[in-house]
């Protein structure tokens, strides 16, 4: 489960510039969480994931994350190898604001870093140097840092699929050892039917050119869809609905921030409350959906399809 609690090796109020050793290897699933504040007069700051701390010659930088506030605000990402910079990857969707606090979550994935700021996905950066070689984090520039924390994890290390708390229905999807993803469409029976306090977790990765995908909670006997979650990346809409008595109801689309982006890893948590479903993406609450299908105990099936790699499903 993606949680920003229980971080390890937390460093509080470090003096900037800060250069510190990362005590364990960064493997897929590891998180680095940096909380701080941008001063009024800041023009730029950077977080560098380095191979050592040498100054002469300068240590290689596997991932250089550099928000800039001068002229057009942007985030510049790059890699430094043998004192030479590679090509810049620039993101103009700027989540940082002067005189505002921030929380940056760097997640290490198998092929890339995934970065979220204040709970919102910001960018992906493909590995040019293996993250397992990174042993140092450096923070430089005009920035105040309140804390740096780590969660060393190998949850995603094997990327082997699982379906805990569910019994898969469509035989072609039955798990094979070492399989890298669950095939779609995926349908599975919950080992215990839905009700207040029940939770379903779906872990996956959005395809590069994804248009949409859907996650449905279904009453198996009637095939009514109690909860239809349908992120549409092509229009940035997170559509919710129910399919009851052979008819779709009224769509709900209102959302503060669309939480998905092509190529990103996600953990979707669906929690069943007495009056509604609550949905969180990557540990951040996203929406509520009032129950339209009242017989919660009849909801016994999970269905997933669309433009994603489905890695893991769990229910308890």
Curated annotation (Swiss-Prot):
GO terms for cellular component: cytoplasm; cytoplasmic vesicle; cytosol. It comes from the Eukaryota. SMART domains: Gal-bind_lectin (SM00908), GLECT (SM00276). Pfam families: Gal-bind_lectin. A carbohydrate binds at residues 68, 78, 88. Its main location: cytoplasm. Gene3D superfamilies: 2.60.120.200. PROSITE patterns: GALECTIN (PS51304). GO terms for biological process: cellular response to virus; lymphatic endothelial cell migration; plasma cell differentiation; T cell costimulation; xenophagy. Residues 18-151, 186-316 form the Galectin domain. GO terms for molecular function: carbohydrate binding; integrin binding. The record marks 58 as: Critical for binding to sialylated and sulfated oligosaccharides. It is found in: Cytoplasmic vesicle; Cytoplasm, Cytosol. Keywords: Autophagy, Cytoplasm, Cytoplasmic vesicle, Lectin, Repeat. A beta-D-galactoside binds at residues 248-254. Homodimer. Interacts with CALCOCO2/NDP52. Interacts with PDPN; the interaction is glycosylation-dependent; may participate in connection of the lymphatic endothelium to the surrounding extracellular matrix. Contains two homologous but distinct carbohydrate-binding domains. Beta-galactoside-binding lectin that acts as a sensor of membrane damage caused by infection and restricts the proliferation of infecting pathogens by targeting them for autophagy. Detects membrane rupture by binding beta-galactoside ligands located on the lumenal side of the endosome membrane; these ligands becoming exposed to the cytoplasm following rupture. Restricts infection by initiating autophagy via interaction with CALCOCO2/NDP52. Required to restrict infection of bacterial invasion such as S.typhimurium. Also required to restrict infection of Picornaviridae viruses. This is Galectin-8. It comes from Mus musculus (Mouse).
């Amino acid at each position: 489960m993606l949680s920003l609690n229980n971080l390890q090796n937390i460093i509080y109020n470090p003096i900037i510039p800060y250069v510190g050793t990362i005590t364990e290897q960064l493997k897929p699933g590891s998180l680095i969480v940096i909380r701080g504040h941008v001063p009024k007069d800041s023009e730029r700051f950077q977080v560098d994931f380095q191979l050592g701390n040498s100054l002469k010659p300068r240590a290689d930088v596997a991932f250089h994350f550099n928000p800039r506030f001068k002229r057009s605000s942007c985030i510049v990402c790059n890699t430094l190898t043998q004192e030479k910079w590679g090509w810049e990857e620039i993101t103009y969707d700027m989540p940082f604001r002067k005189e505002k606090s921030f929380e940056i979550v760097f997640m290490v994935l198998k092929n890339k870093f995934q970065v979220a700021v204040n709970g919102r996905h910001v960018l992906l950066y493909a590995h040019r140097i293996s993250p397992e070689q990174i042993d140092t984090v450096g923070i430089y520039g005009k920035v105040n840092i309140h804390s740096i924390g780590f969660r060393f994890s190998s949850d995603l290390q094997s990327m082997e699929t699982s379906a805990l708390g569910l019994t898969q229905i469509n035989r072609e999807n039955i798990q094979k050892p070492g399989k890298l993803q669950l095939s779609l469409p995926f349908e599975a029976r919950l080992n215990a039917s839905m009700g207040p306090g029940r939770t379903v977790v779906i872990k996956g990765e959005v395809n590069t050119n994804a248009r949409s995908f859907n996650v449905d909670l279904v009453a198996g006997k009637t095939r009514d869809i109690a909860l239809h979650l349908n992120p549409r990346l092509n229009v940035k809409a997170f559509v919710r609905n129910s399919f009851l008595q052979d008819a779709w109801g009224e769509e709900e689309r209102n959302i503060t921030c669309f939480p998905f982006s092509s190529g990103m890893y996600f953990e979707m948590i669906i929690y069943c409350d007495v009056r509604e479903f609550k949905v969180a993406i990557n540990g951040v609450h996203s929406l509520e959906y009032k129950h339209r299908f009242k017989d919660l105990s009849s909801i016994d099936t999970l269905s997933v399809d669309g433009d994603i790699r489905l890695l893991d499903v769990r229910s308890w």
